């Protein structure tokens, strides 16, 4: 009888813990605004921002879902922010153009806030036979350069269009 009581208690505890874990995991994919001392960015629904990321990047957000078939090793979308403190704005923009493969659009924003330069770039690359669309927003502010790069598998570009627009529109350097 005691074994039955202990067994029921263990099962109840496992259900409780499992429910808590599922709720925490679901909450991690909810939209939120990430704000640091240097920039602010909106993380849309369906993306997770790993807290203990050791990539050296200022911000990382990965889509919940992975690609399918030949793209199964890629996230459907990924966003990263790099802070560069020892380079030239034009060099960073040129490097982004080279990395973006086929350039679909590029422009310097004329209405940038005072003291900032902004460059927008959209490109298309292929990695392991998988087409990837990249969106870049590069901002020079003070002595630093902030590089937002969003990569989305071409197959899912339309599904992520609104979320990508929200993320790029919200990217703000202080």
Question: What would you call each of these model-derived segments?
Answer:
Residues 25-58:
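N-terminal "mature-domain start" segment
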Residues 1-27:
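N-terminal signal-anchor transmembrane alpha helix of single-pass membrane proteins
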Residues 50-147, 152, 156:
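Conserved polar/disulfide-associated segments of primarily extracytoplasmic proteins
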Residues 45-47, 144-174:
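Surface-exposed amphipathic alpha-helical segments
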Residues 42, 112-120, 168-174:
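Short flexible/disordered coil segments
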Residues 38, 83-87, 162:
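Residue-level detector of secondary-structure boundary/capping sites
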Residues 16-18, 39, 146, 160:
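Aromatic side chains
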Residues 39-42, 140, 163:
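Structural motif
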